[in-house]
Amino acid sequence: MGPIMSTGETSTAHTVLGCQITDKTVITLFVILVFSCLVAVVGNGFIIIALGMKWLLRRTLSAHNKLLISLAASRFCLQCVVIGKNIYVFLNPSSFPYNPVIQLLNLMWDFLTAATIWFCSLLGFFYCVKIATLTHPVFVWLKYRLPGWVPWMLLSAVGMSSLTSILCFIGNHMIYQNYARRGHQPWNATGNSLRHSLEKFYFISIKIIMWTVPTVIFSIFMSLLLVSLVRHMKKTLLALSELRDVWAQAHFKALLPLLSFIILFISCFLTLVLSSASSTPYQEFRYWMWQVVIHLCTVIHPIVILLSNPVLRVVMKRGCC
């Protein structure tokens, strides 16, 4: 995942490239991780192709679908980076976690992770404004203004994600430069002091701040949306008592994708924070466990989108026939 990994101590979870790999648990987790990422790549790739074809045919795309295709594209690229990085660290478990190869992979990972979180947040904000049955003048005004803001919102998200990745890259590069100056000795006390300080304060602060802001925005607006939908559902069921079962099922189907979106997003955010806060060497079981948990969360949501979005569902049925 992020750059805060430690290899000061040599673990024997699995051996270095060229030697026999003995830890079956690590191998199993690695296979599960790669398979999960491949499923996510296929799911997000299908969303990109379906919406991209619609964009080409109609020469336009709704604001909602622009957000959706941006989220799918960021997740697609993120899963490809995750596969590449984890294949590299699986084959080179004792490599220095700030070497040039991992620096480049971390730069892409930091950018795409931040972009994915921001796009999810913007999608949640969009859902709230367009779907919520709130009558406050601000919400009524936003309903008409929001579609025109979507391109600028996406550009702002890309800008914030770029800032996150650049700040993290600066810290990564400082650690590697210090490591190179001291003769590539990861156990050097002075070098480790700088490294541990940056890992403990600099990286954690940047990531938690940059990830928490969009998560708070997402949580606030999705909470407003759920409250609005529950109130609307209660009023509808009371007014139409003879159709109560039919309406209850319809509302439940509408709420289910939103609830899954919220649960998966919050789960992924918490897992990212917890994994970033722990300095886990690449060789250890915990590193691979965190990876599997994080990316299982990101695998499920594209499937939910495919099953709940009418346009994508029709395209998927045509493709299967």
From Swiss-Prot:
It comes from the Eukaryota. Pfam families: TAS2R. The chain crosses the membrane at residues 29-49, 76-96, 107-127, 150-170, 208-228, 254-274, 287-307. It is found in: Membrane. Residues 1-28, 97-106, 171-207, 275-286 are extracellular. CDD domains: 7tm_TAS2R41-like (cd15018). Its main location: membrane. One of its GO terms (biological process) is detection of chemical stimulus involved in sensory perception of taste. Residues 50-75, 128-149, 229-253, 308-321 are cytoplasmic. Glycans are attached at N188. It is a multi-pass membrane protein. One of its GO terms (cellular component) is membrane. Keywords: G-protein coupled receptor, Glycoprotein, Membrane, Receptor, Sensory transduction, Taste, Transducer, Transmembrane, Transmembrane helix. GO terms for molecular function: G protein-coupled receptor activity. SUPFAM superfamilies: Family A G protein-coupled receptor-like (SSF81321). The keyword Chaperone does not apply. Belongs to the G-protein coupled receptor T2R family. Several bitter taste receptors are expressed in a single taste receptor cell. Putative taste receptor which may play a role in the perception of bitterness. This is Taste receptor type 2 member 135. The gene is Tas2r135.
